[in-house]
Each structure stands twice: as C-alpha cells, then as structure tokens.
C-alpha cells in the first residue's frame, strides 16, 4: 500500500496532534523495527503490499514546515544504526581488492548499489540530491510521494553483473562533489575483479621455458652428432639459470639473458668456427710418413696437423668436468666474462707445449733419429762439411722444417759439392755446431741443391738468401773434447772443432767424426729445449707481423726488430772511415756502430749530441773511454767514487774543470784530426760566461 493509504487507517488517528507535530525521526522508536524481517529470495518479486508493519500516520501538509532533507538525514542515520545493531557489519565473502578500482561515488544514479554476501542483506539506496532539488521534486510529485519506509521495506534486488558494470563504469561528471560518507558502509566494490572496465593493466604471464638443449646449443656451437656427450650435463644448469631471467627477457633486459648464456659459450663466436673442424680431426688420419708432416714452411704453420688437435683439446675442456679439466674450464669461463677474444690467444700460449710435443713426436716417428746401425759404405763416397750456426734457434728450425741456408759464399760451395757428388752417387754430410756452444749438436744430410730464388722467413735473422732441404740423422750433443784430437790438414792442421762455416773435412777425417757421433752415449740434445725454442719462435713471428687494424680501429705496430748484421753496410762504413772524412751526420749520430773512430766514439748505446758535447768539454781525451770505469780498482785506497764520477761525467768543481780543460786544449794542438774546428763550432753550442760577455761588450 502507498504512504497516502497508510494515513487513512482509523487505528492510526488515535495519536495526538502533539505527536504528529514531533519530527518523524524522533517519533520512531527502535521497537517498530522489530517486525522488519530480512527479505529472502522468494520475496524478490514482492511489491509495496508485502510490508510487514504499519507506519504512523503522516500528513505532508502539517509537516511542510519541517525540512525534508533533515528528515531524510535522520531516517537514514537511524536506519543505518538499526541495521548495524541487527545484522552487524556487512562483510563480503571474497576479500580480494582491486588496486585499480573506480571510485564507487562516481555514480549519480539513485539506483541501489548492492553488496553480495552470504546473508543477502538489503541494499541501501542513497539520495545524493541537494535539499533544494529534493523539495522541488517532492512538491511536483506530491501525489506519488515515496517515503523512506517504502524504500527500506522493499526486498533486496539481485543486480546482475551487467548492471553493476554499468553503474560502476559511470564517470563522475565534471564539477560534481563527492557524496557524503555514510557510517557503516565501506566504499570498495567487491567481486568485480573480472569485470572488463575495472581490470588493472594486464600482467604478462610467464612463457613456457625454452629448451636450451636443442635450440640454443645447436645454433650457437654447431656441435656435430659424433662428438662426445659434452653439454648434456650442463644443459640442466643453464636451464635453471635461464628460468630466472625469462620475465626480464620479455621486458627488454637482454643483458641478463646473455649473461646466462655466456656460461655455456666460453669463447662466444669463436666456438662456431671450432665446430666444423672437430669431425675432420676425428675422421682424418695423420699425414703419410713419406709425404712429411709439414710441407712448405709457411704452409705448415697454417695447415699443419696440430691445429685441429689443439682446437679439440680446447673443446674437451668445456665438455668435461673431471679432475684438472674442470679447473681449466672454469678458467676459460672467467676469462670470457671479462673479454672473449683474448681467450684464444692466451690459450694458444698456454697450450704451446702440447702443440710442440705433437710436432716433436711426429719428427721422431718420421726420421728415426740416432740410428743404432751405422752404414759406412755410403760414407766412403760422401763429402763432409762443418756448419757453424749463430744460434740454436736456427738449429731448432732446421730440424723442424728440414731446411738450411748458409751465406752466399757457403751456399755456392755446398751447391757445387752436391752437384759433383750427385753425379757420382755420393752424399753430402753436414756436421752442425753452434758458435761458442762447446759441442756439436748433430749431423744432417744435404738432400737438394741450393734454391737461390727461394727465401725462408723462419730464421732468427732475415739476412739469409736461398735454401736447401736437409735430413737430420743424428741429434745429440757431443762435446768438443771428444773431437779435438782430429786435425784438418786442409785447414792449417787445425782441430776440427776450430773450423769456420762450410769448412770441408777430408773423407777419412769425416768418417772418424761420424763414428764418434754414432757411438757417443749422449745425455742432452736440443730436443730438451725444443719447447723453449717453439715459444721463442712464436714470439718472433708475432713481432714480425705487419700492422693490423685492431678492434678499436687503430693500427697496432709490431714490436721493433733486433738490429741485424748487414755485411754490405759494414763494408761501406769501413770504406768511408778509410777515406778519413767525417760528415756532420756522423758527428751528430753519437755512439754506436756509426761512430767508428775510437778517439771520438761516445759511450756504447748513448745519445750522440750530449755525449759529443761532453767529449768536447773534456777536450776529446782520447785516453778515456766508457769502459775505463768498469776496470778501475775500487778496492784500492786511491779510488774515490766522487772524483771518478767527475772524471767521466764532468766535475762539480768549476776550478778543477777549468784546469782540466786547459790541459786538454794543449793536447789538441799537437793531435791530428780528421775534421776541422769550424765543424765542431757548427754542431756545438757554447755557454757564455760573464768574462766572455764583458769581452764582447768591449770590442763591440
């Protein structure tokens, strides 16, 4: 029934007028709410006639002087207070909250906002209108007036998701103040997590883990199927490490992903080049013995057999985790995280003994050095020569590359002897010895004539021209004492140990030397230092390389080479000194080989200008040299370090220096010089004293 019908009920007219004049919010007592029952689902379709109790009569005209807005405020406050006492706090089941909720006060519609809970409590409809709007609306719609009791008595309506979405998605208009806070009612929407308009920014779901065992490993390394099961054990560890970085990988943090992969690929792009070489190493046998393991010297260093083996050795360090291999693998990983390219160069230096051992083993297998049986029949028709080498480095490379080269004069002598013996079916035998070593290091057979048009770059010095092949037979150290008794009649009856390069040994004397070499029980040989000379050769080769563009784009110049002996340049210097002339260029060049005259030579290796000026200040004392200071008797009582220092580098006492210079100037008058004093004045700067300045002022 409507509110107007309620006022016409006779039972309600017994109340006095004073009670009717009392505001409604003060007349209603708490007992009147006892009859209000919570609506159930069966009462959803109920209408206004389903109310459980009657309200006191209400006359709009009598109470027109009471503000409607105040009455609504009081009624709503009591309703909320009574609802709180009866039903307690309204707590929803689902306590999840969306951090990106829309403000529930956005809606301007007077429709009810529902709270879905277990008890299905009736939703409260709030009136957000201002007092003026409410009065105007009530005056216009007085016959169809709706009281707060009719609204409160209506059963709770189950709002659908679509309705809630519509009400919640309403945007607050510009300039609208927020509604007042109602006590006992929270301002959060519940059970709207899955609503499309209230969704937070989408959270990316973690993708499925990547199978590194089949995708990344095969693409990065190109490992063939016939290799050992190397990276199977490591795939699990890398798989776990990669899972920690999957969410960052999709956010653009690629460095973390690369870091996790760096543990698998120790050498980065270099490993891709190593993959195809491994099957070749396992499948290809060693080169044939008759063909030799090296071929040409330059080709051997690039296409030789040991390089694939060294690559497979390096790959084995990464695929195995047993014993010392684990330590080497961790060492390479640490180096790769800081820098990737220097790993290969460093490993090549560290694995050099392994490479040298392979070279040495192949040489011994091929040549059968130091044979047990000596065939003297071939020695009867052979010619013997003594070869003197400047260093054992050249002996090492001669054994390694099976070549030799002598001076121009020595090459011609050996070439003529080889051609002569080749027609007769004989051989050329060479006894090798290093200058100053005190022993012979072996014997080799000359195999080919001298090739004057070919030059090898493997020697420690670049002055040698031409080459010929040799075959080493004996490699052992035989002291000179065992051979010193052999005299050579064709060399002023000197001992064979006192021979010059390419000195021919008569046949009978040569056979005697050969027998001693064969029967001597040696304890040392150049093979003992083979690894040392291999490393030294690598250093020399790297220093001789032309400038290359490094990764920074700059030219990296090679290390300066040691000064080599040049016979033609030495002859020119000797001829120039013999003519007695001295140019200004040599005067300023200072000490060294260019300053041939011992009277004017500066200290060995010292600068030219400063040294010559000191020589001039000392009056060119020809009796002094830079080596005199080394042989003085430092233990004698007459030795004075300070005075001795002053005699060489100039005294600190000007008086002594003045006397010393005057004495030496007297010697210059009687000394023959190969240059004039005017030339000296051109290249020497004098220091003017106060006396000189006074004299110049007097004559000017």
Swiss-Prot record:
This is YTH domain-containing family protein. One of its GO terms (biological process) is negative regulation of axon extension. Interacts with Fmr1; the interaction is RNA independent. Residues 23-39, 62-72, 114-125, 147-168 have a biased composition (Polar residues). Keywords: Cytoplasm, RNA-binding. GO terms for cellular component: cytoplasm. Disruption phenotype: Results in fusion of the adult Beta lobes in the mushroom bodies. It is found in: Cytoplasm. Specifically recognizes and binds N6-methyladenosine (m6A)-containing RNAs. M6A is a modification present at internal sites of mRNAs and some non-coding RNAs and plays a role in the efficiency of mRNA processing and stability. Together with Fmr1, regulates axonal growth in the mushroom bodies and neuromuscular junctions by repressing the translation of several mRNAs, such as those of chic and futsch. Its main location: cytoplasm. Residues 382-517 form the YTH domain. Residues 1-191, 250-352, 537-612, 624-665 are annotated as: Disordered. Residues 300-313, 324-339, 568-579, 624-645 have a biased composition (Basic and acidic residues). Residues 589-608 have a biased composition (Gly residues). Residues 73-89 have a biased composition (Basic residues). The keyword Isomerase does not apply. RNA binds at residues 388-390, 394, 404-405, 435, 459, 464. InterPro entries: YTH_domain, YTH_prot. Belongs to the YTHDF family. Signal peptide: none annotated. It comes from the Eukaryota. GO terms for molecular function: mRNA binding; N6-methyladenosine-containing RNA reader activity; pre-mRNA binding.
């Amino acid at each position: 029934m409507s509110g107007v019908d309620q006022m016409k009920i006779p039972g309600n007219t017994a109340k006095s007028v004073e009670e009717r004049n009392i505001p409604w919010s003060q007349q209603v007592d708490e007992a009147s709410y006892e009859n209000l029952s919570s609506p159930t689902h069966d009462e959803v379709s109920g209408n206004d006639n389903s109310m459980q109790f009657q309200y006191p009569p209400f006359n709009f005209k009598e109470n027109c002087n009471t503000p409607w807005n105040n009455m609504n405020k009081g009624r709503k406050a009591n309703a909320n207070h009574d609802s709180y006492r009866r039903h307690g706090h309204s707590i929803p089941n689902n306590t999840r909250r969306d951090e990106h909720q829309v403000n529930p006060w956005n809606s301007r519609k007077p429709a009810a906002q529902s709270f879905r809970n277990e008890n299905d409590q009736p939703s409260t409809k709030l009136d957000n209108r201002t007092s003026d709007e409410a009065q105007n609306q009530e005056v216009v719609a007085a016959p169809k007036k709706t009281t707060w009791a009719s609204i409160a008595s209506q059963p709770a309506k189950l709002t659908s998701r679509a309705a809630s979405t519509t009400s919640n998605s309403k945007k607050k208009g510009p300039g609208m103040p927020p509604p007042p806070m109602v006590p006992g009612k929270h301002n959060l929407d519940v059970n709207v997590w899955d609503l499309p308009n209230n969704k937070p920014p989408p959270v990316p779901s973690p993708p499925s883990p990547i199978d590194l065992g089949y995708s990344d490993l095969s693409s990065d390394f190109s490992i063939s199927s016939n290799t050992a099961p190397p990276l199977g054990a490591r795939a699990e560890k890398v798989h776990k490490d990669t899972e920690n970085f999957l969410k960052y990988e999709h956010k653009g943090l690629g460095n973390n992903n690369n870091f996790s992969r760096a543990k698998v690929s120790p050498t980065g792009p270099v490993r891709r080049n190593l993959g195809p070489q491994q099957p070749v190493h396992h499948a290809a046998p060693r080169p044939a013995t008759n063909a030799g393991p090296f071929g040409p010297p330059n080709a051997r260093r690039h296409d030789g057999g040991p390089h694939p083996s060294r690559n497979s050795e390096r790959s084995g360090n990464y695929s195995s985790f047993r014993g010392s291999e684990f330590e080497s693998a961790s060492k390479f990983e640490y180096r790769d995280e800081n820098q990737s390219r220097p790993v290969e160069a460093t490993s090549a230096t560290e694995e050099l003994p392994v490479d040298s051992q392979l070279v040495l083993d192949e040489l011994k297998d091929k040549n059968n050095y130091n044979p047990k049986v000596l065939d003297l029949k071939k020695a009867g028709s052979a010619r013997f020569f003594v070869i003197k080498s400047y260093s054992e480095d050249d002996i090492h490379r001669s054994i390694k590359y099976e070549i030799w080269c002598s001076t121009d004069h020595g090459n011609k002598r050996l070439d003529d002897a080889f051609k002569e013996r080749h027609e007769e079916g004989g051989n050329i035998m060479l006894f090798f010895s290093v200058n100053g070593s005190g022993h012979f290091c072996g014997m080799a057979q000359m195999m080919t004539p001298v090739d004057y048009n070919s030059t090898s770059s493997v020697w420690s010095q670049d002055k040698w021209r031409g080459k010929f092949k040799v075959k080493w037979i004996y490699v052992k150290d035989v002291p000179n004492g065992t051979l010193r008794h052999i005299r050579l009649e064709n060399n002023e009856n000197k001992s064979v140990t006192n021979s010059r390069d390419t000195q021919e040994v008569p046949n009978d004397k040569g056979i005697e030397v050969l027998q001693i070499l064969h029967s001597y029980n040696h304890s040392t040989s150049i093979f003992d230092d083979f690894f040392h000379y291999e490393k030294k050769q690598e250093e020399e080769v790297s220093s001789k390389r032309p400038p290359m563009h490094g990764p920074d784009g700059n030219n990296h110049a090679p290390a300066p080479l040691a000064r080599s002996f040049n016979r033609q340049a030495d002859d020119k210097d000797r001829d120039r000194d013999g003519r007695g002339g001295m140019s200004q260029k040599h005067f300023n060049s200072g000490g060294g080989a260019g300053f041939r005259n011992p009277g004017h030579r500066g200290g060995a290796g010292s600068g030219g200008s400063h040294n010559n000026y000191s020589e001039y200040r000392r009056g060119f004392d020809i009796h002094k040299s830079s080596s005199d200071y080394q042989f003085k008797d430092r233990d004698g009582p007459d030795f004075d370090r300070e005075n001795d220092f002053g005699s060489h580098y100039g005294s600190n006492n000007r008086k002594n220096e003045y006397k010393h210079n005057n004495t030496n100037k007297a010697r210059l008058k009687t000394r023959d010089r190969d240059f004039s004093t005017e030339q000296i004045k051109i290249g020497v700067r004098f220091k003017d004293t106060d006396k000189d300045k006074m004299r110049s002022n007097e004559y000017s």
